[in-house]
Amino acid sequence: MKQALLCMSHSPLLHHLDPPADVKASVEAAFDQARAFVHNFDPDVIVNFGPDHYNGFFYDLMPPFCIGYKAKGSGDYDSFAGELNVPEAMAEDLAQFVMDQGLDIAISRQMEVDHGAVQPMEIIYGDVASKPLIPVFVNSVARPFVKVARVRKFGEAVGAYFKNSDKKVLFIGSGGLSHDPPVPQIATADEAQRKMLTDGRNPTPQARAARQQRVIDTAVKFAADEADIMDLNPEWDRGFLDVCASGRIEDFDRYTADDMDAVAGHSSHEVRNWVAAYSALRACGEYEIAYEFYRPIKEYISGFAVTTAILRDI
């Protein structure tokens, strides 16, 4: 088995707000399953599809996709803040291959990734830099969005590059399912918010702390059914997980940005990272789900899922 997959939700609230004990225990059990799966597979290289929450990518230049040749963590919510262990030559070769498939992407020699990208690695390995990892940014919060079909094709191109590799490759997709946290939208942002969305790099510790506290406060209210944000949508979440499990990746194409906003929240677009990861695995062959966990968790403001998948023996 040369390719495998781990897709999982992330939440900056994991270490800031606890759900009920039974829910927290079920999440920890899911993380244990994910750790065992990944450590048993023991990848040589990891391709990490992840979003950003205006910590590394901003409206001054917002690509739909970006492959990092070098990268560091932003350290938001006390997440990893060091240099990632990026195999630079492989990342360069991957980017050129994807472009040769007719997909226009960006590259970065100085990528900054936030909690949304690094949290799976923190959970699985502790040290994000412990394994060679190619960071792949997929725009998941900033309109305008490319069609989901384009995300699928991008993922397939990445997978095609690794299909015949002599390396064991793990595709990670990081993103919450239905959720609508208090992330400003450019269409309704005030002047200060527009400035942050356009170029909010290097915030002061006080500004970052205030921004993060707003999210934590919203989560507390949301768990008490007092927050003015969209509720989670378990039905939508389970429907999306069914598509992931089916292997019919063309079915991802039916998802549209407007519908996702309306029924699953403005940050449900983070499932684009799942689409890319599952499409990458499917490009390597038919797959089957090895493990699936799902709970709607208000304390994390997220439809929260963990899945692993392996290629079928044919």
Swiss-Prot record:
Pathway: Aromatic compound metabolism; 3-phenylpropanoate degradation. Its EC number is 1.13.11.16. GO terms for biological process: 3-phenylpropionate catabolic process. It catalyses: 3-(2,3-dihydroxyphenyl)propanoate + O2 = (2Z,4E)-2-hydroxy-6-oxonona-2,4-dienedioate + H(+); (2E)-3-(2,3-dihydroxyphenyl)prop-2-enoate + O2 = (2Z,4E,7E)-2-hydroxy-6-oxonona-2,4,7-trienedioate + H(+). Gene3D superfamilies: LigB-like (3.40.830.10). The active site is at H115 (proton donor), H179 (proton acceptor). The keyword DNA damage does not apply. Keywords: Aromatic hydrocarbons catabolism, Dioxygenase, Iron, Oxidoreductase. Signal peptide: none annotated. It holds the Pfam family LigB. InterPro entries: DHPP/DHXA_dioxygenase, Xdiol_dOase_suB. Its cofactor is Fe(2+). One of its GO terms (molecular function) is 3-carboxyethylcatechol 2,3-dioxygenase activity. The keyword Iron applies. HAMAP family: MhpB (MF_01653). Homotetramer. This is 2,3-dihydroxyphenylpropionate/2,3-dihydroxicinnamic acid 1,2-dioxygenase. It comes from Rhodococcus globerulus. The gene is mhpB.
